[in-house]
Design a protein with these regions (language model features):
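Short, catalytically relevant binding-site loops at active-site mouths
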Residues: 19-22, 43-45, 66-67
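Active-site beta-strand termini and strand-to-loop segments that position acidic
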Residues: 41, 49-54
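Metallo-beta-lactamase
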Residues: 1-38, 88-101
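Cap/insert and terminal regions of metallo-dependent hydrolase folds
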Residues: 46, 54-135
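Active-site-proximal beta-strand elements of phosphoester/diester hydrolases
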Residues: 33-40, 58-63
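Short solvent-exposed loop/turn micro-motifs enriched in small/polar/acidic residues
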Residues: 14, 42-44, 110
Length: 135
């Protein structure tokens, strides 16, 4: 009920988490440079903000990949609500990120703020580590 005045004044914008007509989670575009993708393995409809900056796509990894140590398959967190969904979403995202040369920005990594990716014999792995301020 506390949110009703904000909604009634037109200041509240709901985000449609369904990105396609098939009902799968998708992506919502806010501006030409800012979008949010949705994943549902860790929690339902968790938001991963994506920002295009200086020709790169920076993705805030939230709890899909909380640290660089979670990049290798099949590492997922034991308390994910749907760990098999996380694994599927992670695998798909890593291939997209590798192909698009995305910058991954980690929420919980105590050592590494960001990295890009490379394909190795053992799968997708971090390539270079750097601070967000270096972009």
């Amino acid at each position: 009920e506390n949110i009703l005045p904000i909604e009634e004044s037109g200041q509240l914008r709901y985000i449609d988490v369904r990105g396609s007509s098939d009902g799968k989670l998708g992506e919502t575009q806010f501006t030409g440079n800012i979008s949010v993708r949705f994943v549902s393995g860790h929690t339902e409809a968790m938001m991963l903000p994506q920002i295009k900056y200086k020709g790169k796509t920076i993705v805030y990894m939230a709890d899909l990949l909380p640290s660089a140590g979670h990049i290798p398959l099949p590492y997922v967190m034991a308390y994910d609500m749907f760990p098999l969904t996380t694994l599927h979403e992670k695998k798909s995202f890593l291939q997209e990120a590798l192909g698009g040369d995305y910058i991954l920005f980690f929420e919980h990594d105590p050592v590494h703020e960001c990295c890009n990716l490379q394909q190795t014999e053992r799968g997708v792995r971090p390539k270079d580590y750097f601070k967000l301020s270096a972009i």
